[in-house]
């Protein structure tokens, strides 16, 4: 369905949005409105999505149109989309194989000469075309097609590609997959289509994806980014360089806190490190790795770098007698007292 989104510039629409911005969406859908000059349900979708976008997309929240109610759920957040875009800095032409709401394409376009953005849903591409025009972005070409089909028909070379494949299996709406090899579009089909005309591809994946298994499934992976926001792991990024070469990838653990990105990088092969155990006592510091470090399984690597000892076997808590600087990728506490589990101490 090709949708005309010009109604969002209608003063009556803006008045509707303003008047009902805090009203429950279900209540609005049941309420009768006579002689509206726009689609009521689509307008209510805008209200719902704008509410959620205020935190997720603060720059764009009220400047774009949302084609469906899941648009805001599935899109990249502003902070992570800007990070994605930086990975393409200096590229001439980038292809976004899974456009969605177009947030990644929007920010990538600011770092590159041109972007081709593909999506199979016509209502989605209609919305993205409207948004790009309204935002003054003229170096993004939005195409309504399936990624595999487009790549079969168009043989143009690209500097790089970006893909955020769907994690839901197509034959079972109640089944969810976290393995990249099982997602849609099928990366196993995409790679042969682009590897001869592209320098690299960035693949976005669920934070639940198994990093070791993914590297095993796609030996051409050269870099991995584990991205957290305020100590909550949000997503994984995998870079595959072309031509593909099998080597140990670099793992970047990043946590975005306030306006700072706390990063720790290591080689995938470095994971086998032994850390001594110790006993806590007052005056020491207690170290808790952040979510990206935990997802990477790099807690002992970090401990080794910072000269820490482990609280106990199978523990991910660490100790030090020396006050460290603020570069530690996690939380740091001062130990003021150590209590046993005896009844007097517990009381």
Model-derived features: positions:
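SAM-dependent transferase fold signal centered on methyltransferase-like domains
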Residues: 1-347
């Amino acid at each position: 369905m090709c949708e005309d989104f010009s109604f969002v510039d209608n003063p009556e629409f803006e008045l509707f949005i303003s008047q009902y911005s805090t009203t429950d969406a279900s209540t609005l859908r049941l309420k009768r409105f006579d002689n509206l000059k726009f689609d009521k349900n689509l307008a209510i979708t805008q209200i719902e999505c704008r509410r959620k976008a205020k935190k997720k997309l603060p720059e764009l929240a009220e400047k774009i149109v949302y084609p469906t109610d899941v648009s805001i759920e599935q899109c990249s957040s502003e902070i992570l989309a800007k990070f994605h875009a930086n990975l393409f800095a200096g590229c001439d032409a980038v292809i976004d194989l899974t456009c969605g709401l177009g947030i990644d394409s929007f920010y990538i376009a600011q770092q590159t000469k041109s972007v081709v953005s593909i999506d199979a849903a016509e209502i989605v591409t209609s919305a993205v075309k409207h948004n790009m025009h309204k935002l003054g972005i003229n170096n993004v070409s939005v195409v309504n097609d399936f990624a595999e089909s487009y790549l079969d028909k168009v043989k143009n070379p690209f500097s790089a590609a970006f893909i955020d494949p769907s994690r839901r299996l197509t034959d079972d709406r109640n089944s969810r997959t976290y393995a990249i090899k099982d997602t849609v579009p099928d990366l196993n089909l995409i790679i042969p289509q682009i590897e001869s005309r592209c320098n690299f591809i960035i693949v976005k994946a669920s934070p639940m994806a198994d990093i070791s298994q993914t590297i095993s499934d796609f030996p051409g992976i050269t870099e991995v980014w584990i991205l957290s926001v305020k100590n909550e792991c949000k997503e994984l990024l995998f870079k595959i360089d072309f031509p593909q070469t099998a080597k140990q990838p670099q793992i970047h653990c990043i946590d975005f806190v306030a306006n700072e990105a706390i990063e720790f990088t290591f080689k995938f092969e470095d994971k086998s490190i032994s850390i001594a155990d110790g006993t806590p006592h007052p005056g020491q510091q207690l170290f808790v790795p952040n979510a990206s470090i935990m997802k990477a399984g790099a807690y002992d690597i970090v401990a080794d770098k910072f000269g820490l000892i482990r609280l106990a076997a199978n523990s991910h808590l660490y100790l030090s007698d020396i006050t460290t600087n603020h570069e530690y990728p996690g939380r740091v506490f001062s130990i003021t007292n150590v209590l046993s589990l005896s009844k007097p101490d517990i009381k």
